[in-house]
Amino acid sequence: MIPHYYEDPHTLHVGTMPNRAYYIPSSRRSDALVEHRETSDRFQLLNGSWKFRYYASIYDLQDAFYEVGYDASAFDSIPVPSVWQNHGYDHHQYTNIRYPFPADPPYVPKENPCGAYLYDFTYPKDATAPRAFLNFEGVASCFYVWLNGQFVGYSQVAHSTSEFDVTKFLQDGTNHLAVLVLKWCDGSYMEDQDMFRMNGIFRDVYLLHRPEQCIEDYFITTDIHGSTAGVAVRLRYYDSAVAARITLYDAAGTMVGSVTPVEAPDDAAFPYHAEITVVDPTLWNAEQPYLYTLVLDTPNETITDRVGIREVHVANNQIYVNGQSIKFHGVNRHESDPVTGYAVGFEQTKKDLLMIKKHNFNAIRTSHYPDVPYFYQLCDQYGFFVIDEADNESHGASEYYCEGNESWPNHVENWNKPIADNPEFTEATVDRTRRCVERDKNRPCVIIWSMGNESAYGYTFEEALAWTKSFDPRRLTHYESAQYRSKNRKYDFSNIDMFSNMYPSLESMQEYLDNEPDKPYIMCEYSHCMGNGPGDLEDYFQFIQSHDGLVGGFLWEWCDHGIYKGKMPDGRGIYYYGGDHNEWPHDGNFCMDGLVYPDRRPHTGLLEFKNVYRPARVVKYDRESGMLTLHNYMDFVDLTEYAALTYQVSCDGEVIDNGFIPYPDGFTLPPHSENALPLAVHIPDKGKCFLKIFYHCDKDLSLRSEGHLLGFDEILLENEDSRNQKTLAMWSDAPSNSTITVQETDRHLTLRGKNFTYNFNKLTGLFAVMQYEDAVLLDKEMEFNIWRAPTDNDRKLKLDWLAARYDHCMTNAYRTEYQVTDSGVTLRAKVGIAPISLQKFLDLDVCWTVFNNGAVTLALHAERNTVFPELPRFGLRLFLPKEMARVSYFGMGPMESYCDKHHAASHGYFSSTIWQQHEDYIRPQENGSHYDCDYVQLDGAGIKLTAVGAKPFCFNASHYTQEELTEKAHNYELHPCDSTVLCLDYAQNGIGSASCGPRLAEQYRLDDASFDFSIRLIPEKA
């Protein structure tokens, strides 16, 4: 019934117009075409409710459904744009690398699902604009088009615009549009991105009404020459030339220049040229996104566009924009919505960019395909550097069976053969690059073209890179997978401007930089943001800033990919991930790897990034001179042009001073420089004192309003005694005239004081019962705690932990003894901790002191068997009454914090409920801990329990046990226990980003051969 184009890599498009730049024409100038393109009288949007029928196989479609008069009464309806999986058809499937069908390019399964779409619309003929062009901005995977029963054409490449001249097919009045979308085609082998696989017409469909003679395409370039700049416009017309006028206006609306294009016969692609000279131009960059307006007038039509004057080049292994070396503080962003899937509309796109900007990112990589056209216009306007990536990924080819040699090097050796180095796919590879480049070529935000992602390297990419450099030599090129190639021949890398890598360790980057490289190093993906993480951002930041040849990178990734499935009883969303739709193959929750949840609530990792990448930092504070030295990490803007500074001094959690920091007369702090300004503050002689410096926007600044917090620094102030005085007071032995009696059995020691009864288990060296003032403190025996619910970043390490059986440990006290003193009772025990079936890995010398007033101090020394892997954690776990549901503490808060993930938190006194401590990751895991704490207090039901450390410790308070968090696959499956679970930790293993990255850095591993831990428990009546 249909031409068999969908398995022919040499028939990519039929009946489509040549690639061109994105624009929306109008009959008159319109400055609202970015946010409101529907205001153009030449733009007819065809979105809405379409008739739809799903077929499980293309062979089930026997009717000529596209014919006028076809009985479509059996059709359902579906919104366009949308993906059909989100409307009850087919099934969702998430895979990262593996093809969801047999790998036999260019062939796809015979039972190829498809969707038939029908839509009737009225076409109002306009004598001044009689031509009509039908645009599809995104369809997955390929599609056939009929209009009024006549075949119009075919196209593929899901995330790119396909345009058809339908003038001869249209009729006055009602028109009948039919579209057939196939789930798979030969192009599906090149659309193997790490995402849910979805299908349908997922971007806008519209008609453009055009005059008979008009501009077809234009290419804007800018060159800077000292105090002037040239704005050049190369253009071509449909059929024949037409009178044109090109005018440039500045942001205030003042005309800068106006010219008429002249013929340029030597330029076949754009045979008409024009250039406007701008004196004293205001340049575009990500921090100051200044835009001019360009108006292209022809009879009966006007095209309005934006121009950013900027240059980009590589020198000295650095990337320069307008002559200034830059660093990318970037993020990878998929177009993903939990309700609409691929169909991410304007408002969601704008919301994402607003959040990204507010959290101090300056760059975005469009992973791994071109985004909707208005995304780039918004990036121009808001200020982002963009790596624009072609819709090309054939990662599944790396999974081919390799003749019994399944080693990674052998997979790399063979990865390129099916597609990247296969001449049959050269046309398709170049086509995907061209469709990206030619559509987005006029966007100043785009400074790098990327050939695609994870597709190995070969002849096809050499051709794509050569074409890109020839077509647009003013921008840079990127392709990370150039390193994955066969050793059997030499390859051409001359058209790649940078060395790109994913998830490198600091050591591997240092090795590259030490070998006198000839290209800058960029991390196209790093710090995998899956679940609780990432935990290595500060280390990467410091490394990036200390090496000129390292130009920064792009976190993976912006949002969790989840499918919305309704709400829990408490109103929280339910989200599915890979495998939840009974699909196979799938890759589980590996799609839940973003800085925000599917509904765009921030993960704590997003807050961590924001403060790590704050635009300025304190270098030092000299108490004697009262001088505060700052470094400006911005690339273009002086600190005084964007930031207002305030300060706060706290002592033992109490704010004792705060105020505004004025800039001295003549003070400047240019980009990449340091300077000092005066700040005199009073510092008490005693107490743990911190100085916090806050950076606020001092005016509206590209999506960030005046007063918006850009970040903060925290400095521990030196004084005579920098210990927390409240902590010291808690460690003081309170006098008591009472005494303690001890009763001993073979199993227990029962200690009774004036207002407490404690039962000590001699077999474990731990307290089994604690009652104070007739209130129960322990619901069950306390435990030495080793396990934590593995985080997503523990996904590799947890295999070692499970092999060591850290989740099934037993505690054995070899001997115990006690001694009664005037102040209380001392209990000593020799304790071993061993996994079931394995040898012991911890020896503990334990000393408990129970004071007459009921306070209890633990002091222990631990020796670890170093043949075992690093510990998840070590500490005490207490099961307190559930009614003890309020927590107060001095430590790092208010959000969760860990040894390598605490830069969004700060030291202070915080108070909340236990439920507020829980970070509700979609896949349950360790969460809600607090690092560097002096004390924590839980209270409720008339009783309080305070834990105070001899040294700073970590704690976690939750209504979920670590066993529950470990066992359950989704947050909506969790059941709270009947206790408040308090974990008092000597330390936890760091967080890192090893879910898809290097092993946790050594300094964050809990692998001490020996350590000491001391903590005091103080019960009180509330």
Task: Name each model feature, range by range.
Residues 193-214, 570-629, 633-654, 666-668, ...:
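Catalytic cores of secreted or luminal carbohydrate-active enzymes
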Residues 1-38, 90, 95, 189, ...:
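Extended substrate-binding grooves/exosites of carbohydrate-active enzymes
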Residues 147, 228-263, 627-661, 687-696:
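Beta-strand-rich binding/interaction modules
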Residues 171-174, 234-313, 685-726, 733-735:
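Extended acidic/polar, glycine-enriched regions
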Residues 261-279, 653-686:
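Intrinsically disordered, low-complexity Pro/Gly/Ser/Thr-rich segments with frequent PxxP/GP/PP motifs
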Residues 85-86, 183, 285, 680-687, ...:
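Beta-strand/loop-rich accessory regions of lumenal/periplasmic or secreted enzymes
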Residues 86, 91, 98-107, 156, ...:
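An acidic-aromatic loop/edge-strand motif
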Residues 1-13, 36-37, 51-55, 83-91, ...:
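Accessory beta-strand-rich segments of carbohydrate-active enzymes
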